[in-house]
Amino acid sequence: MARRGYRVTAVDLSAGLIDVCRKRLIEAGLDGQVRLVVADARDLGEVTEREFDAALLMGPLYHLIVEADRKTALKEAVDRLREGGLLFSAFLSRFGVLADLLRNNPGWIEDQAHVQSFVTKGKRPDDFPRGGFRAYSAHVSEIVPLHEAMGLETVFVSGVEPAISSDDAVYNRLEGRQRQLWLDLLYTISSDPSIMGASRHVLYVGRKK
């Protein structure tokens, strides 16, 4: 976005990642285009502007496992949009990650307490040991109501890896015309409700009323 001339405010909970971002911006000659802020998505008090054209939540809503925290983070972002501003938010899909689990950790299925908690609640059991990848996987049916309750008008919801979650590495190796034709097809079908939940990630786009 900065390369396209937009002024950007980038927020992350990790000071270390903000430092990495700062170094890359300097290397690219874009440090004057981007303001960097270390903050929790649930408290954007340091971001005082209320007239952003767009806000991108590319992680907080699937790392916050408590529903109230997700709602708080979403409200913080929406409150900083101008009227008509766009919000983009990413989710892990409840069932889209199963292909990865089957391929990389087939023994997961034997921990039935974990399996049932994931299927019904989208997260690990409450008594699961701390550490590792901590995430919430949303059911597709909850995404639109969550956003519209915050005063957003839904523009579209799409699966990010529609129909290819089990083998997107093959797509990533494609080049030229084949890659473009596959991209066009996947974009066309990405909002089909029958396959959206099979994507690893789901993208919501909404407009502030």
Where are these regions (language model features)?
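Class I SAM-dependent methyltransferase SAM/SAH-binding core
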Residues: 1-44
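A C-terminal cap/extension of S-adenosyl-L-methionine-dependent methyltransferases
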Residues: 155-209
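A short glycine-rich, Lys/Arg-flanked "PGG" loop and its adjoining helix->strand segment in the class I
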Residues: 71-86
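C-terminal alpha-helical "lid/dimerization" subdomain adjacent to the S-adenosyl-L-methionine
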Residues: 110-135
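A short acidic, Gly/Pro-enriched loop at the edge of an enzyme's catalytic core
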Residues: 42, 46-55
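A short SAM/SAH-binding and catalytic strip from SAM-dependent methyltransferases
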Residues: 53-68
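Conserved class I S-adenosyl-L-methionine
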Residues: 86-118
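Short alpha-helix
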Residues: 132-157
